[in-house]
Structures are given as C-alpha cells and as structure tokens.
Amino acid sequence: MEKEKDSKLKQAMKGLDSFLTTHYSFRYNQITEQCEFHDKHKFDKYRVVDEREFNTLVINAIEEGVNCMDRDMRRYLGSSRIPSFHPVTAYLEHLPHWDGHDRVSELARSVSDETQWVEVFHIWMLGMVMQWSGKNRMHGNCLIPILVNPLQGLKKSTFCRSLLPPALRGYYTDDFDVTREGDALRKMRSLALINIDEFNRMEEGKLARLKNLVQMSGLSMRRPFQSSYSQQPRLSSFIGTSHFCDLLTDSSGNRRFYPVMTKGSIRLPRINYKQLYAQLRDELKHNRRYWLSPKEEQAVSLRNDAFLRRPIEESLFYSCFSLPRDEEKFQRWTIGQIYEVMKKASPETMRDVKMRAFGKHLALMGVKKLHTRYGDQYLLNRL
C-alpha cells in the first residue's frame, strides 16, 4: 500500500515537473526571496507567483491532466529545483565590453562642474557597484553624496532615481527611516539605492545613527520565522537631496557626506546604462580605487565646514561669553558651568540642547579647551 502511494506521488511530481518546465520558466529572486515565472509561449515578463498566480498554475496543471494538489505545487516551487537569480549581479554579469568613453564624469557634470565633486562622484559610483557585486565584505560604501539647492523642481530626486537602469528601478526607494532599525536593515539588504530625501530634516541623533549604518558591510538580522540572527550581505548605497545648505551637525565626523550645490535644473544626458555600468565594472576589474584616501577624506571634511548646521544656541553663547584673543587673560569653565549660565539667561533656548551635543557645539564655535585631571576646562571670558 505504501509502495503504491509512493509510486503515485512520484508520478504526480514527474507529471507536474514535465508540465511546468514545458510551459513556464521559473526563478527564485534572491533579493525579494520570491518565486517568479513567465509563460514560455507568451514571451511575457517575469512576475511573482502570488496567491492568485499560484492558484492559476494549479488549475492549469489539473486541466492538463496532471494529478496534483496545492501542496505538490507549493513543494515544487519552494524547492531547489527552481534556479536562484540575483537581479543586480545578473545585470552586471551580462554587460557588454566598455567602449572607453567616460560616461561617469559626464553624468557628474550634469549636477556640478566642481572638479572635486566629479572625482568623488566617480568614487562613489564605483563603491556602489562594488557593493552590488558582494565582493567587498570588509567595508560598506560609506560615502553619501547630497544634492543641494534651495529651489524646488530642479530634478534632484529625478537624478537620484535615474542612476539606476530601468531593469533595477524597482530596487530604489526614497522612504527610509533610521529609527526603525529592523525596517532599515531589511531595506539595506534588499535595495540597490536609497535616497534620503530632504536630508536637512534629519536630527543630530538620526545623523549619528545613519553614519553607523552606512559603514556596515554586513547586516546582523533575524529573518522572518527564525529565532536566531544571521549575517546578511548589504546591497544598498545611499544618496540624498536637500533644500538647505546647513545640514551637517558634527564638524569632526562629516567625511561620510559630500553635499554639492547643483548648478540649477539638472539636465540629465541621455544615459547609455549598459555602457555606464560596463565602465564601472571594467574600472573595478582593473583595481581602480572605490574609496576615499585619507588625504581625500581630509579635503572633504574641510570643504564640508560650509555645510555645517550652526547651533541654535550660538547667538546666546556670544551674548554670555567671549573667546580670548592671543595672550589675553582667560577664565576656565567646565561645560556644566557654561551650560548653567546660558540656561539661566534663556531657558527656552537651552531647553532642547542636550549636554552631549552641547560639547560638540562648543567645538564647532571654536572654543578651546584644556584636558586636566578634573576633566575638560574651556577657555572663555564672561561678559
């Protein structure tokens, strides 16, 4: 009886396999973790086997005389019989030979003619493609270009979206919240490019969290229906847009960002995506550098001072204290003493200024300090 049952099951699976491979092509999308298919006779695009399509496949199989049930179809589609497919790496693997024309610099100049920007954008694009390839397991693409202009309608977001070829446009988003860690990590695993729109709205704490995220090469995540965490590869790179110039908060740690003023409405060249990405692929094959050197990081950090967000308490500070000039006498103040003086002068201004951030703000305002056994002491004069 058992042998007869096994024989019927084998026949059913054999019939199902014959029917499906004759009429359809299947693939398992490693990014979305979904089974996709297309009809061989209709030459249509691949689409997800959702519940509706699944039921249609079962009905079609039964109508063709295949003795199968839902569980048989589910077992088949959930097996390794379905070949794996990674849309991003597959795109890179099927690119033509590069014709030698520098399309990356051409694309960068549609935003700005600044020489440093053109070089940094090129490095960032190389980093993005290296991130996609999965070969850089030690470091993530930790640079974020930010397109800046106070005017709206200049196609900043359009430029960001247009960096991806049409075949990969579904792996782009401008919806990203660093405070929702689980969702943020999932998007970093499954999206090719994340645009942080209106970057200037990010609070100081969120910027610090973003800097941590952007340096990750791997992601420690708990997958659906699993109790333990596992290491997942990161796919995404980041870009941003802003209406305001004062968008950075930390003068000592802004080398991860590259704000650039657009020269007006961005006029995108007609992009030959296959040649654009063939250039990047070939440059990486020839070991072109896809990260900033220490000297370049220092230069980026210096130029970014122009994009620093001034502390809200800066005017209050200068109404209470002055910075001593060379050889001028000074007083030593602890950060707590400075904070209390300013809080007494304007409680409303200091209400949202956290002590940890206040220390960074003092450094940003150029306040010198001494390291003593009693802690840091700031050199100031009381007005």
Q: Residues of each region from the PLM?
A:
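AAA+/SF3 P-loop NTPase mechanochemical coupling elements
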Residues: 184-189, 223-241
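P-loop NTPase catalytic core of nucleic-acid-dependent motor ATPases
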Residues: 79-189
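Conserved catalytic/switch belt of AAA+ P-loop NTPases
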Residues: 208-230
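A short helix-turn-beta junction within AAA+ P-loop NTPase domains corresponding to the substrate/partner-engaging
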Residues: 248-267
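N-terminal nucleic-acid engagement/recognition segments and initiation subdomains in replication
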Residues: 1-101, 115-119, 348-349, 368, ...
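Conserved AAA+/SF3 P-loop NTPase catalytic/coupling segment centered on the Walker-B
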Residues: 192-215, 248-253
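Positively charged interface segments
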Residues: 226, 267, 330-383
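Conserved alpha/beta core segments of nucleic-acid transaction machinery
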Residues: 286-329
